[in-house]
Design a protein with these regions (language model features):
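Residue-level detector of anion-binding/catalytic polar loops
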Residues: 36, 171, 228-229
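Active-site phosphate-binding/coordination module
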Residues: 20-118
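Asp-based phosphoryl-transfer active-site loop
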Residues: 1-17, 192, 223
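Anion (oxyanion) recognition and catalysis
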Residues: 31, 106, 110, 166, ...
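Conserved acidic, metal-coordinating active-site core of Asp-based
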Residues: 108-211, 217
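Short hydrophobic/aromatic-enriched beta-strand-loop microsegments
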Residues: 58-64, 136-138, 229-234
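Mg2+-dependent phosphoryl-transfer enzymes with acidic/Ser/Thr/Gly-rich catalytic loops
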Residues: 20, 179-274
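Short, structured coil segments at secondary-structure junctions
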Residues: 55-57, 64-65, 168, 225-226, ...
Length: 274
């Protein structure tokens, strides 16, 4: 059994226009072969649900930087005693609630003695201006359940922000424009490992091979826990934070690189894709 875990922005989706057209033929063949393609992303459930419908994904997905795994109720065999019913899904939650994330951001701001601006503090127009997201996508990006992105303060180093956040019992993914405050138990690697184990539990006699595709250091934890990690490069080269790891680097950026890499891996495993 093959499991494909993938980041979205800059990996399955182009970084500049969020396009995915070049990956559609491969995605369609994977669905025909019942090979799960599992998004692992900082995006919200609302954002991923729309994308899944557009590109035909039907399996579980991991949101908000590994804060939660959503399993469609049609795949209840992957649930566990720790999961809870969440509408159309079984939910495995690793992160805090959104209320706790907002309270945490306030505590971090007080500890840094620096006002911090979270997504909830921004209007939809301001988020559109900062991110370039379409208005309807801004609404979905604001529909957060477990984490709070905030504008990265420029007068502190990444290390200073991380140390302050950790002392308060949270984690932070520091980015150039936005950072993400997440729960102490959350993380892409942990969520991926948990879901892999659920597949093992549901099919104990099956040989499971895991693939992971990502383009940034935020994907490291995911890439480190799969058997076949693949780096999707930027337009010029891979991210410096992913260099010198001996991992496969896709032949192109974005969705074209994703499609090329997945096709090559499948063919090497005698799963022949066109």
């Amino acid at each position: 059994m093959l499991l494909i875990f993938t980041d979205l922005d800059g990996t399955l989706l182009n970084s500049d226009d969020y396009g995915y057209e070049a990956a559609l033929p491969v995605l369609k063949q994977l669905q025909t072969l019942n090979i799960p393609v599992i998004p692992v992303t900082s995006k919200t459930r609302s954002e991923v649900e729309v994308l899944r419908e557009k590109i035909g994904l039907t399996d579980a997905f991991i949101v908000e930087n590994g804060s939660a795994v959503f399993i469609p109720i049609s795949q209840r065999n992957l649930a566990s005693p720790q999961t809870q019913n969440w509408g159309d899904y079984d939910l495995m939650q690793f992160g805090f609630s959104y209320t706790e994330a907002r309270q945490g951001l306030k505590a971090v701001a007080e500890a840094l003695n620096q006002p911090l601006t979270g997504f909830a503090d921004l209007t939809e127009a301001e988020i559109h201006q900062l991110t370039g997201l379409a208005p309807e996508d801004v609404k979905r990006a604001k529909d957060r359940e477990f984490t709070e992105p905030f504008i990265t303060p420029k007068n502190f180093t990444s290390l200073e922000i991380e140390q302050t956040v950790n002392q308060l019992g949270f984690q932070v993914v520091v980015g150039d424009r936005f950072s993400h405050l997440i729960g102490q138990e959350a993380g892409k690697g942990k969520a991926v490992q948990w879901l892999i184990q659920q597949y093992h539990n549901s099919q104990p006699d099956a040989k499971i091979i895991t693939v992971g595709l990502g383009n940034s250091p935020n994907d490291l934890a995911m890439l480190e826990v799969v058997e076949i990690p693949v780096i999707i490069p930027g337009k010029k080269c891979p991210h410096p934070g992913l260099e010198n790891r001996g991992w496969e680097v896709a032949s192109a950026s974005g969705c074209q690189g994703w499609a090329n890499a997945v096709r090559e891996i499948c063919n090497s495993l005698n799963i022949y894709l066109n």
